[in-house]
Amino acid sequence: MATTNDLKNGMVLNLDGELWAVVEFQHVKPGKGGAFVRTTLKNVLSGKVVDKTFNAGTKVDTATVDKRTMQYLYADGEDYVFMDLETFDQITVLGDTVGEAANYLLPEAEAVVATHESVPLYVELPTSVVLEVTYTEPGLQGDRSTGGSKPATVETGATVQVPLFITTGEKIKVDTRDGRYLGRA
């Protein structure tokens, strides 16, 4: 149990039986009336974002989220199997829980899996990964590094916009947060 004065970005709250992560918060002290805390909360399971206002000092129930580094093993249908690197236990994470991270997951890649009471909540990848381009249209002679971009399919099946000079078989660095091309690897 904590108060609204203790809120931090990333903290997970248990409100009405649902888990909500604090995306943003602001303490407001108006000239007239009592202080309050304006928050933006994201539902950990559904991804829904809401704005909620609390009176300052209100008690809120915090949830314990366990973050562990795990190794991605394989896809099992629409689900993904990870192995805990310390205990070697395997857990299955639903495809909806993995979300967009699936576009950048390679077997044996490490990721942080957050759980609450042994239920996987979300998967965090490193900010960038190195992937091999499996297909892209050939560039034309005279292509420059300052030119436009073209779509390229990487080994995970995701499509990334790359500069015209990138060819099939090259390894590129991709930002996992937004899928941007960062450079050659």
UniProtKB/Swiss-Prot annotation:
Q: Which Gene3D superfamilies match?
A: 2.30.30.30, Nucleic acid-binding proteins
The record's section on PROSITE patterns has: EFP (PS01275)
Q: Keywords on this record?
A: Cytoplasm, Elongation factor, Protein biosynthesis
Compartment(s): Cytoplasm
Query: SUPFAM superfamilies recorded for this chain?
Result: Nucleic acid-binding proteins, Translation proteins SH3-like domain
CDD domains xref list:
S1_EF-P_repeat_1, S1_EF-P_repeat_2
Lineage: superkingdom: Bacteria
What Gene Ontology terms describe where this protein resides (cellular component)?
A: cytoplasm
Q: Name one GO molecular function term.
A: translation elongation factor activity
Query: What is the protein's major site of localization?
Result: cytoplasm
Pathway info: Protein biosynthesis; polypeptide chain elongation
Q: Does the keyword Cytoplasm apply?
A: yes
Set out the biological process GO terms recorded for this chain's protein.
peptide biosynthetic process
The UniProt similarity line reads:
Belongs to the elongation factor P family.
Main function: Involved in peptide bond synthesis. Stimulates efficient translation and peptide-bond synthesis on native or reconstituted 70S ribosomes in vitro. Probably functions indirectly by altering the affinity of the ribosome for aminoacyl-tRNA, thus increasing their reactivity as acceptors for peptidyl transferase.
What is the protein name stated in its UniProt record? Elongation factor P
Name of the encoding gene: efp
